[in-house]
Structure formats: structure tokens, C-alpha cells
């Protein structure tokens, strides 16, 4: 049996708003029909780059640090962090471990994600 990643799904208060942030952050388009209850990126495109992203409205708010989060890679870490903050992210910390550098940010609903400096 082969398993593959289909989607990242984020619980949220407003799926369209959070979906639009992530679409802009990833340089992708929000799928047609996005609304407050559900939105997606790449779900309706069979030729999409995997994985797709889904956003589902839930009644409860975020109450703790994410146990899993996306790590994005950027050629220019500082410029990408500045761009994401301009889209609505909140910078949390700049970190370094071994030869790897990254910044931790929060999306508009407080979900953690990292932007890693591409060492290539």
C-alpha cells in the first residue's frame, strides 16, 4: 500500500479569509466558491502541485501551540518574512540551529509556521 499526502487542513474562524492569506503567501489561487465555512487551494485542480490546502470553520478558537506546522523555504529569508508580514502574518522569532536559519511566524488566526533560509 502506498500513502501520500493529499492536503493540509486548518481549522479556523473564517475559511475564506484564512484561505486568501495562504493563497497569497504560497503564490497560488483560492479555489472558486470559497466561503466562511470552507475554502481550499488546489482541491479543484487535478493537475495541482501537491498537496492542496483546505480551511474549515470550527466553533472553537485556537487554544494551544500547533503540534504540527508547515515549513516553507525561501531563497531570501528576510525579504520573504517581510512580504508575509505585509500579507498579515505576525513575526515571532528568528532562530538558528547548526547551519540552518529560520523565522517563526503566525498566520492571521495564530497558526505557527516557519520560513527556512534556502541553503542552496
Tell me the role of every PLM-derived stretch.
Residues 2, 9-52, 80-82, 86, ...:
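Core segments of cupin and vicinal oxygen chelate
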Residues 15, 70-109:
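Vicinal oxygen chelate
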Residues 33, 119-120:
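A short acidic/small-residue loop/turn micro-motif
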Residues 37-39, 66-68, 101-103:
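Short beta-strand micro-motifs in enzyme catalytic cores
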Residues 41-46, 105-108, 118:
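Active-site beta-strand termini and strand-to-loop segments that position acidic
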Amino acid at each position: 500500500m502506498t500513502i501520500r499526502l493529499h492536503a493540509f487542513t486548518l481549522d479556523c474562524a473564517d475559511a475564506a479569509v484564512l484561505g486568501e492569506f495562504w493563497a497569497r503567501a504560497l503564490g497560488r489561487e483560492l479555489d472558486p466558491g470559497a466561503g466562511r465555512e470552507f475554502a481550499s487551494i488546489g482541491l479543484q485542480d487535478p493537475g495541482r502541485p501537491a498537496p492542496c490546502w483546505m480551511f474549515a470553520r470550527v466553533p472553537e478558537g485556537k487554544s494551544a501551540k500547533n503540534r504540527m506546522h508547515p515549513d516553507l523555504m525561501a531563497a531570501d529569508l528576510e525579504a520573504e518574512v517581510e512580504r508575509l508580514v505585509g500579507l498579515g502574518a505576525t513575526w515571532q522569532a528568528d532562530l538558528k540551529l547548526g547551519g540552518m536559519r529560520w523565522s517563526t511566524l503566525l498566520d492571521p488566526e495564530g497558526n505557527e509556521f516557519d520560513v527556512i533560509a534556502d541553503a542552496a
